[in-house]
């Protein structure tokens, strides 16, 4: 959750949507080639591949792919290549067709939702490109009926509102909790998908109360809040929305503690025989939430260069909120903030 917190704090008033699963996969690839303090800092983000496989096996709506492209003239260490396995492929980064092929691979895998991943030609110094893409599409276990969707005011702030297409569902049982914390009060609800995933929605009691909740959104707190959920008959109202995101994560990750991972401070002596540095980490995302299903995709790439009770209540999402798509085992696939309907894609 720390990466989400950093991005959210630097993009006040904007929608945010990221995939921790995709980001962790790329950081894991970098970890395989890292040494010393660089490896130590990356180790907290190492993705256990069996966890990704578990999600993929138990929920056919979620799939992930990792690819590592290495410059054909570079000499990579056998220990690094063994860890990467069949994900590795040598390419000519100076050939414009290489970028086209990589973008096409991500485009096809994400069902056309991430295109292009790479907007500009790569530097001639590019030694390695690590890519992770994830795609998620799942139907609601209890779909919203389209006849109940209508225009409804969404309060961007206490004094400003815009109309949104609000989906509604009445008198259904969902896991729900009202949480009181020193930093603010809020409600949390679990909206399950068919299969082993669900969307958790965190809604502050106050229209302008989201920032303090974001600042305290840690993995520990999130697990605690989820453990407080109880089955409740409740009316649910949540906007239909689409959001896209594009981020260079270097500054965010440095602020999150990865101070010796990027630029000249990174030690990747377990990757190849020459001195290399990680100069960029690009993350692109897409999500579509509607009455029938949620569809989401994300792709991340790192450029390595030479040097989600019985009394009927109401849960009305009519002001900024946080949403998390997670697997039943607790793994967070996507996390986002929705606060600006006018910037839907």
UniProtKB/Swiss-Prot annotation:
It is found in: Host cytoplasm. SMART domains: SERPIN. It comes from the Viruses. InterPro entries: Serpin_CS, Serpin_dom, Serpin_fam, Serpin_sf, Serpin_sf_1, Serpin_sf_2. It holds the Pfam family Serpin. GO terms for cellular component: extracellular space; host cell cytoplasm. The record marks 306-307 as: Reactive bond. The keyword Lipid biosynthesis does not apply. One of its GO terms (biological process) is symbiont-mediated suppression of host apoptosis. Keywords: Early protein, Host cytoplasm, Host-virus interaction, Inhibition of host caspases by virus, Modulation of host cell apoptosis by virus, Protease inhibitor, Serine protease inhibitor. One of its GO terms (molecular function) is serine-type endopeptidase inhibitor activity. Induction: Expressed in the early phase of the viral replicative cycle. Signal peptide: none annotated. Viral serpin that inhibits both cysteine and serine proteinases involved in the regulation of host inflammatory and apoptosis processes. Major anti-apoptotic protein which inhibits both intrinsic and extrinsic pathways and strongly cleaves host CASP1 and CASP8 but is a rather poor inhibitor of host CASP3. Prevents the proteolytic activity of host interleukin-1-beta converting enzyme (ICE) and ICE-like enzymes. Can also block apoptosis through host tumor necrosis factor (TNF) receptor. Belongs to the serpin family. Poxviruses subfamily. This is Serine proteinase inhibitor 2. The gene is OPG199.
């Amino acid at each position: 959750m720390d990466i989400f917190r950093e991005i959210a704090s630097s993009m006040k008033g904007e929608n945010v949507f990221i995939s921790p699963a995709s980001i962790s996969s790329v950081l894991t690839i970098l970890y395989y080639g890292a040494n010393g303090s660089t490896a130590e800092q990356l180790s907290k983000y190492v993705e256990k591949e069996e966890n990704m496989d578990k999600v993929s096996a138990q929920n056919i709506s979620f799939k992930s792919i990792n690819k590592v492209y290495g410059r054909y003239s570079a000499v990579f260490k056998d220990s690094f290549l063994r860890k990467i396995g069949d994900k590795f492929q040598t390419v000519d980064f100076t050939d414009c067709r290489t970028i086209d092929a990589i973008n096409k691979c991500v485009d096809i895998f994400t069902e056309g939702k991430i295109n292009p991943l790479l907007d500009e030609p790569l530097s001639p110094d590019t030694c390695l490109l690590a890519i992770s893409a994830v795609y998620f599409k799942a139907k609601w276990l209890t779909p919203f009926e389209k006849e109940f969707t209508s225009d409804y005011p969404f309060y961007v702030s206490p004094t400003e509102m815009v109309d949104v297409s609000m989906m509604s569902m009445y008198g259904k049982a969902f896991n729900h909790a009202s949480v009181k914390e020193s930093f603010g009060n809020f409600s949390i609800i679990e909206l399950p998908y068919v299969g082993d995933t669900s969307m958790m929605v965190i809604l502050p009691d106050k229209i302008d109360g989201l920032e303090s909740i974001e600042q305290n959104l840690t993995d520990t707190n999130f697990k605690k809040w989820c453990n407080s959920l109880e089955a409740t008959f409740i009316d649910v109202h949540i906007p239909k929305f689409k959001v896209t995101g594009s981020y260079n994560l270097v500054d965010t990750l440095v602020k999150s503690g990865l101070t010796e991972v990027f630029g000249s401070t990174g030690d990747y002596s377990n990757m190849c025989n020459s001195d290399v540095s990680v100069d960029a980490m690009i993350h692109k995302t897409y999500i579509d939430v509607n009455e029938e299903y949620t569809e989401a995709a994300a792709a991340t790439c790192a450029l390595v260069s030479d040097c989600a009770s019985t009394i009927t209540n109401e849960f009305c999402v009519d002001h900024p909120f946080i949403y998390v798509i997670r697997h039943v085992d607790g793994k967070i696939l996507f996390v986002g903030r929705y606060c600006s309907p006018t910037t839907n894609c």
